[in-house]
Amino acid sequence: MVAAKAKADWIPDRQDIIWIDCNPQAGREMRDRHPFLVLSPRAFNARTSLVIGLPMTTAEYNADNPFALAVGAAKGAKAGKTSYVLCHQPKSFDWRIREASPHRLKRLPDSPFFEVCAVLNQIIQLA
């Protein structure tokens, strides 16, 4: 009962890494359940049920992609592979409907998170 309550109270926050189902997808968009780096703040995510962020992958072809930022080594079944944040694929998802859940990595450390934001800003040029 306590675990169910904890999950019911959970709301993703900026810098969290979560699991989310990216389906449906089209073209070169990511599909299926993947890690996702949250960019939007907890208050926004709670109020709107949306989460804005970037998908993550261990697909090796991203090593040559200037917009895929390597953020460390994967763990678990993907141990030994590099984790990439796909800065060129910002997305918003209804995290409640898609039954998002916390990823075992929990949160991206400050330094790589700031690098991800800098690469994203090179693309969308907010500031």
Where is each model-derived feature located?
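Conserved functional hotspots at enzyme active or ligand-binding sites that engage polyanionic ligands
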Residues: M1-A127
